[in-house]
Amino acid sequence: MPFNHNSKAKRPKFLLDLQIKELVNIPQSSGYCYTKWRLKDGTGTSGHKVALDGEHQTTSTQSRGTTKHVHVQHHRAQWNYSLDKPILVKLHLDKNGRFLKKILVLDVFFEFADANSSLTSSSSPNGKVKKTTYANATALTATGNNSYSQKITGKLLLGTVDIDITEYVKEDETPTTNRFLLKHSKVNSIINVSLQLKLVRGSYEDFNISKSFTNGQLANYRPGINTILDNTSELSSPTSTTNQMSPKNTFSNFNGIGTTVAKPGTNATGNSTSIKSPTSTNHKSSEMTTKPGLSTTISSSMSPLIESLYQKTFKLPWDPRPGEFTPRECVEDILQGGNGWAKNEKGINLIDLQALRLNEMEEEYYNPNYGNNLGNKASSWPPNPSDDGYSTMGKREYLEKKQNWSHMSRAQRAKLRTHNDEDNENTANDKGSDKDNNSVEDNNPTDFLTDRIRENKNWSIITPSG
């Protein structure tokens, strides 16, 4: 393909139309989501009007923006955000006529909402967000598109997406919609974005158009059963039917609430809509009228079912350690910057404290003098069965105790255990064989240690032996 070396041909201009539609697979079922977008290195333009198809069109040179803050419903945030005016963007070419990358960055944020508090919306004509800082939380109130009714207790960056807009240059200039998995994220949320580029300066013969995408778009992805129902309800019926809907039919959704469907053939404005059937019994195209909002009604009635199925994934039977998080609590902790493990009031992981306790008991059994060493309180910790010491142990005390039982190497531990086993065996032989074997077995220190370990590992599944 010939490449024009004209200076302007190396810098074609396009009108960028951006749409940010929705975010799906959000772990939380409540809260707020919004997206910030920006073009790296700006737009490279300064004009506000271009001549397109013989008409002057007003454009924008903004290189960043923000969607509205929307409430998360059924683990989905729907913005349907679009630009008021297309953005005039200047792209650059290399010596081979290929586009240099122009990156569009999307930053997706999630805001945690306190369900126990509510705020009064202030009257603002432009719908701007008002921020009020409290001692431990930030309360946001807004009107217009941003509808806050709860106190915002924290903000979290869910993830980012980098899109090379030069890959969306198409000669037919049709919009392209893709789904992107969030990067630098701990969740599998997917954002739906649509891009369209229209050439306003230069010619398509001046550059090479990319034939593929390299930004990790998800192809042929369906976010859930709601979208499947919406799409299938719009498809044509494969065969004609004689079953006609009554003037007013009522069916129950999954909440037990009756939903009324208006008479087919008329919508809310009185205009009829129809779906053509490709085949019929008399080989003629027939028409079946339906209400255009029916698919939306079915989709809405399915939402509680989807919610229920989603919740059940967090309630699978399992055997957690005492005091540990449930799967839902684990996800919440990770999203708030934690590691997914429950902690005591001093910030020490309970699983680490449990491991310390088991190792101390093991060391105490194999080394009788371990608890009598200076500065070592292993035999007296925890002080009583009702106080496990988890809520009071700080980081310093934990590190000191951990160092006390880890001062010996693994080989030294094994040698000490072998020596103690031989001493115990010789002592048992000296006692004589006149004692009852059952009594000796009941007072065996090994059984006592096993019982103590099982008491602390009550989360383990014990399979009964045959």
From Swiss-Prot:
InterPro entries: EEIG1/2-like (IPR039931), NT-C2 (IPR019448). The modification Phosphoserine is found at residues 433, 439. Residues 266-298 have a biased composition (Polar residues). The keyword Phosphoprotein applies. Residues 262-298, 374-393, 400-452 are annotated as: Disordered. Residues 4-199 form the C2 NT-type domain. Keywords: Phosphoprotein. It holds the Pfam family NT-C2. The keyword Signal does not apply. To S.pombe SpCC1494.08c. Present with 396 molecules/cell in log phase SD medium. This is Uncharacterized protein YBL086C. It comes from Saccharomyces cerevisiae (strain ATCC 204508 / S288c) (Baker's yeast).
